[in-house]
Amino acid sequence: MNETIFENLPQKMNLISDLFSRVVFRDKEACQDLVKIILGEGYEVTGVTSQYDITNLQFRSVVLDILAETAGEEPIHVEFQISDDDDHMRRVRYCNGSIDTHLLQKGKAYKELPDVYHIYITMNDFIGGGQTVYEIFRTVRDREGTYSTQYLVENGVHELYINLEIPLDDGSELDHLLRYIKETTEENEDACFGPVSYTHLRAHETPEHL
């Protein structure tokens, strides 16, 4: 009988670790499950690349944990961050700019630039609002300082910041998934979440995969 990945994992190795998550979620089916639970139906993942390197010869290059592409050619960037030693939102801003430079061919109109999705999963609630999920919306502020949602100011960038510090505790699939990412154990797999778990993890049973 083959050993399972749980028997081979270093102590305290969980899916929040980018080392582990990039191995698991480069599997298209696992990534599809992740995207479906977080973004909802309607996003068919057609390809996945882990550790996607965007090289810049003059300025800082970036390496994305997971970059998926949908049937609608919309990039979905998934990032896992344990530490709080940098500015997460500015990191996403820089990643977005780097992705954009590879999306629009010369001669194309800006309106042809596809939507891009950022799913940024952190250990801590760095925003500090006491919420599990933060979705960023662009809005308008007038000269009196009043914010209005009356005007459509979307630019095609979708940002979701999800933390593992504040549990949802609502029994939803997302609740199960986040608990499983935080504590990736066989016990939690059985109690919490199935589709992204054992089936895909068993494909990476030996230490050399990590």
Description of each model-found segment:
Residues 1-204:
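Elongated, amphipathic alpha-helical interaction scaffolds
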